[in-house]
Amino acid sequence: MHPSTVRREAERVKVSVRVRPLNERENNAPEGTKVTVAAKQAAAVVTVKVLGGSNNSGAAESMGTARRVAQDFQFDHVFWSVETPDACGATPATQADVFRTIGYPLVQHAFDGFNSCLFAYGQTGSGKTYTMMGADVSALSGEGNGVTPRICLEIFARKASVEAQGHSRWIVELGYVEVYNERVSDLLGKRKKGVKGGGEEVYVDVREHPSRGVFLEGQRLVEVGSLDDVVRLIEIGNGVRHTASTKMNDRSSRSHAIIMLLLREERTMTTKSGETIRTAGKSSRMNLVDLAGSERVAQSQVEGQQFKEATHINLSLTTLGRVIDVLADMATKGAKAQYSVAPFRDSKLTFILKDSLGGNSKTFMIATVSPSALNYEETLSTLRYASRARDIVNVAQVNEDPRARRIRELEEQMEDMRQAMAGGDPAYVSELKKKLALLESEAQKRAADLQALEREREHNQVQERLLRATEAEKSELESRAAALQEEMTATRRQADKMQALNLRLKEEQARKERELLKEMAKKDAALSKVRRRKDAEIASEREKLESTVAQLEREQREREVALDALQTHQRKLQEALESSERTAAERDQLLQQLTELQSERTQLSQVVTDRERLTRDLQRIQYEYGETELARDVALCAAQEMEARYHAAVFHLQTLLELATEWEDALRERALAERDEAAAAELDAAASTSQNARESACERLTSLEQQLRESEERAAELASQLEATAAAKSSAEQDRENTRATLEQQLRESEARAAELASQLEATAAAKMSAEQDRENTRATLEQQLRDSEERAAELASQLESTTAAKMSAEQDRESTRATLEQQLRDSEERAAELASQLESTTAAKMSAEQDRESTRATLEQQLRESEERAAELASQLESTTAAKMSAEQDRESTRATLEQQLRDSEERAAELASQLEATAAAKSSAEQDRENTRAALEQQLRDSEERAAELASQ
């Protein structure tokens, strides 16, 4: 009996279509409620109705023909999940119906050893994820569970049932990956930070092996023992899977997700000695694919990153469509097909699904569509691709090791023989027992050999992993040594930088010290300069104040002397009026003199007016052109010259008064000599008139003195103003020359007038006789004038008192000025103290800067020492690393020698096993031949027995 060949089954891809209910967006749209799809679940036919009208703004003109003709599509199964019954009146399909039709066969194929695949294809928002995962993956039971949790639940139930028989056990492993932007990410991989967006993606590479097929290198597979484990892992993967909200779907999948279930059988056999032998049995792989939905950018209105995601999704789905077209064309046309190789490698998705499409797999496809007219084009495109996929033919084979398959066949034969021995002929049973013992020994031997080979393979894999780990450790040590070398170099560079920085800090400190010393010298010089300037200003102000006080005292004394002279002269006039008489001519002369004095007073008033005008002109010039030191000097000179001219005019007036006094004395003597009462009366009148003139002159003198003080005050104000222009100087000089000329002209006129008065006084004697007639009238007038003179004397006394008060006020001003100057002196001293304190603080800052520099120097020296210590540590670590590297190389060489020896032993063992297998095959052939001979003999004996029994029965 020869071993059976590998079991292979060729069948096409099973395609199902599921029509979902209308969603909220479609119910709210004007044409959303128009259903364009009809289905007959019993006949598995989907009909796309004619789309009438032209109101659908989203329709493409290229689909016009398709809209006018209804199209029927035949599939393997149709699930109508719309609320209303289908065209045949069947009730809507549930999640349980989908599982019974698709999921249950997948579980059966998995335990039979066939690879299988289920992938959902359709537009975004058409119900793919709901069909595959359900409304809530965390819910372990309920009507809303999807195909995936139901498949896992059925796998664990079947696993428990098989393991209960005691011949084998099944191991289930789960993997979960996604294809996002043409990169494959392991959703169960160990992430450093653990959350999407905050942690790193764990990418894996897609590889292809001649015997294993397509696999993911570096993928993490987790063994699961219950549905709770599956749900937990799926929730972990969904937590890091890429999803987003679009106009078409609130939770749109932005990647293709693949759940991989790996089933491995482990068979057990007990020998006669009681030893348990474990061997590998069947294995299978199940891929549950939730494809991202195809979408039109105009409808989903995505942009930015979502636009990039939609582009990659549509490209991968387009590649999937091309693969389906090529495989379908190859299946239907054979050698006449246009393409002989499908473009699997154009996309990561199609590369992963290579075995599922046209390879070693039993594949199911479920296409999900929307019945709404809003999705007419997408629905029609999905149905066309699904219909095209039905033409793809896969050739699936059982995944089982030939030796394990042979052991399984021997076990099946032994089980058949055990059943044949029940109630049979003893001799036949004895023969069968012998053959059964031979088969059992052969099976046990093969199982032991297989177990030994598996252990040896596992040992070799362990050694290979150890070798790879050693190589990885070596490379890691080399990288660490290089990193340590770089770190030491960086430390040296840092030490050099710190040393250079220290030098720069020292230079900067020295530079700052020099700048600080220069700044301190500048401040000292500025302080000395300010102190000298303040001292000079104080001395100057003190001199000005003393000169002003002295001038005021001098003027006061002059005023007192003038007042005493006037009073003395008044008494003399009074005595002359009482003791003598004046003649009419003398009276006229005195009157004429009085008139001249009044005119002279008018002229003096004009002089004062001119001086005031000059002062105003000077003020205007100062306002227009500014003030300078030169203008102050000019103004002071002008004021001094005006004051000199004023004193000259006063002196001239006093001279005239003295002349008048002399004339009065001469008249009085003449009057005394003549003893003329009338003349005496006239003389009294003349004296009174003269007294009035003197009083007027005194008043004018006082006014002039007041104006002089005002002029002096103004001159002092002008002296305090420091800016003027050359034009002001020239104008002031010109005005001064004009004033000088005017005053000189007035002085000459006054001298001429004085000469006239002298001549008039000489003519007074001649007019004495003519004045006697008016003496009586004049006496009354003189008496009145005398009373006025007395009143004027009282006014002069009050003016004297006011002058005294002004003097006191001037003294107070002097005192206040002195206090102000003293305050300024104190302020200057305080400023000097502040500058001294600033100097002290600057010195303290300098000391602090020196301390900081010393501390910085100590810190840098400490860091330098630490860097040197670190460099020494790094050098020691480098030496130890080098020693460890050499030790690792020695270990690697010894491990390599050991592995090579083990490999040679394995090869020798394999040769022995091969020879044993050949001997076993020869013995097996001999045993089979003996068994055939025995069977033929037994059959002959059985026929003989039957003939004998027939004969006995006939007898």
Curated annotation (Swiss-Prot):
Region (Disordered): 682-712, 725-955
Keywords annotated in UniProt: ATP-binding, Coiled coil, Cytoplasm, Cytoskeleton, Microtubule, Motor protein, Nucleotide-binding, Repeat
Gene3D superfamilies per record: Kinesin motor domain
Localisation per UniProt entry: Cytoplasm, Cytoskeleton
Single GO MF annotation: plus-end-directed microtubule motor activity
Coiled coil segments of this chain: 426-955
Region (7 X 39 AA approximate tandem repeats): 704-955
One Pfam family hit: Kinesin
Positions of ATP binding: 122-129
Keyword Methyltransferase carried by entry: no
Each Sequence repeat, start to end: 704-742, 743-781, 782-820, 821-859, 860-898, 899-937, 938-955
Primary localization: cytoplasm
Annotated Kinesin motor domain residues: 12-392
BP GO annotations: microtubule-based movement; mitotic spindle assembly; spindle elongation
Composition-biased stretches (Basic and acidic residues): 785-794, 824-833, 863-872, 902-911, 941-955
InterPro entries: KIF11-like (IPR047149), Kinesin_motor_CS (IPR019821), Kinesin_motor_dom (IPR001752), Kinesin_motor_dom_sf (IPR036961), P-loop_NTPase (IPR027417)
Family per similarity comment: Belongs to the TRAFAC class myosin-kinesin ATPase superfamily. Kinesin family.
Stated name of the protein: Kinesin-like protein K39
Lineage: Eukaryota, Discoba, Euglenozoa, Kinetoplastea, Metakinetoplastina
Protein's gene: KIN
